[in-house]
């Protein structure tokens, strides 16, 4: 009888261990399942969700893209709290398992392309000491209705004073001018392709600096001035909405243009504002 109970206990213990191992394997498989061939096309990736702790960690980093890529995979793209230590050494350790997975290189490159070329916030501060107030919120995929219902693929930086042609707009990155001119929705706009390949879109400008398509730009170069142009097929239309700058960021993945949420990149840059002499308010 004693031997029978002993064998039964051993069997039950083994079953518990195997069950726990199986659950662990299922969880691990689910975790690694976050990294797929089309991960960068998903809404979860495109939202670019970050908590305040991660923003604090990357604030002084020059090339945060790969680290953020690991963070998103570990947290289900910000859906789960991050349980690790916010140190570069901890992320290096966590990254080892991800770097062995299929599709890591393509995914990590997308993260670097979005983040590693960022240098300056697009609205400078005034050299004369005046507090030129601006504000922005996370309005990613908020409903917009001009030309049909759609999601808002960008972030609007709102002018503290509703004065067109007053707030300078500078390039967030190095790069070259890919597009310049009028768009029905975007008004006067510029598109800058950064060295890594991301496309930075600046819309509703009042006017342009002396800049043309094909010109090289450096981060901090003047692109133009904030305005309220757009929402019309007629070039030059103004006043359909308050003065603001619409910022968009786009990737090219498998030949497809993919928008990503600029809000967290702008938060990362909000203390990196160059000084500039503002003109008179008209």
What do these predicted ranges mean?
Residues 1-14:
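N-terminal Sec-pathway targeting helices
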Residues 170-207, 234-243:
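Zn2+-dependent peptidoglycan hydrolase active-site motif and core
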Residues 189-190, 217-235:
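Short hydrophobic beta/alpha edge segments that flank linear recognition/processing sites
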Residues 238-282:
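Acidic, glycine-rich catalytic/binding loops that coordinate metals and/or anionic ligands
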